[in-house]
């Protein structure tokens, strides 16, 4: 992911900064606790595509 692009992108919900998780290929919004996927080098910034970081896998 291009560092210049990361400087420009913000969370589409809160407009806050994002952190790049290289291993998971996601952009993380710590304020909203959401992870936006990066597919083929393209960040998918749709709120309905974000993964909720508050949900523990295997729980409802």
Curated annotation (Swiss-Prot):
One cellular component (GO) term of this entry = cytosol
- Listed SUPFAM superfamilies: Trm112p-like
Which Gene3D superfamilies does the record match to this protein? 2.20.25.10
Q: Which InterPro entries match?
A: Trm112-like
Annotated signal peptide: none
Q: Which HAMAP family match?
A: UPF0434 (MF_01187)
> What's the family?
Belongs to the UPF0434 family.
Instruction: Output this protein's name.
Output: UPF0434 protein mma_2578
* Organism per entry: Janthinobacterium sp. (strain Marseille) (Minibacterium massiliensis)
């Amino acid at each position: 992911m291009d560092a210049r692009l990361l400087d420009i992108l913000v969370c589409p919900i809160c407009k806050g900064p994002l952190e790049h998780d290289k291993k998971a290929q996601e952009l993380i919004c710590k304020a909203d606790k959401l992870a936006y996927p990066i597919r083929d080098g393209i960040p998918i910034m749709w709120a309905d595509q974000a993964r909720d970081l508050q949900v523990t896998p295997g729980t409802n």
